Amino acid sequence: MTKKILFNDKYSLTQEVRYGNKTMTRRLLRDNVPLGNWEETAKHLSYKVGEVVAIAQSYKSIYAEMIEDFAKHNYHTPREDAAENFRKEYENTAGWNNKMFVKAALLPHHIRITDVKVERLQEISEEDALREGIEEFCFDYFLPNDYSKPFLMPRDAFAVLIDKVGKKGDWESNPWVAAYSFELVD
């Protein structure tokens, strides 16, 4: 069974993954406690090294990609019919607008988990903050697709981002996280 992973769209993190600008993600550990040793903790992580995971997106965005792909390559029927059939089948489902309800097997884009480590949230390095999608421009750092407030260091921008995509206070509480590195497969 294929698993899926969700990224925050409000801050364009799904897009950042698809463009190769985000190659790392942190997920809170359940119960915020590592299980004593690495082997025990690793058994309970959501994703394993080498695992291929689908990138969650809504059926509507999958349909839009199909139409864009057909237009770009000047495809005509039966591919246009396939897109229309897809739309008819899924546009009245919960997954049309909400990627949480989309079947992982239908998702067209995937990542491969290349590394995982367990650490406190604030142990993130400057380099890893950049891999989380923080953008560098000139001598400043910014949240993904938001150039309204510059930060001096990538970690500073990441601290703000994590409180926006999670809940306010996540950075300050410094929870245990699984830090997954990944590469885009398709």
Language model region names:
Residues 1-186:
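Secondary-structure transition motif
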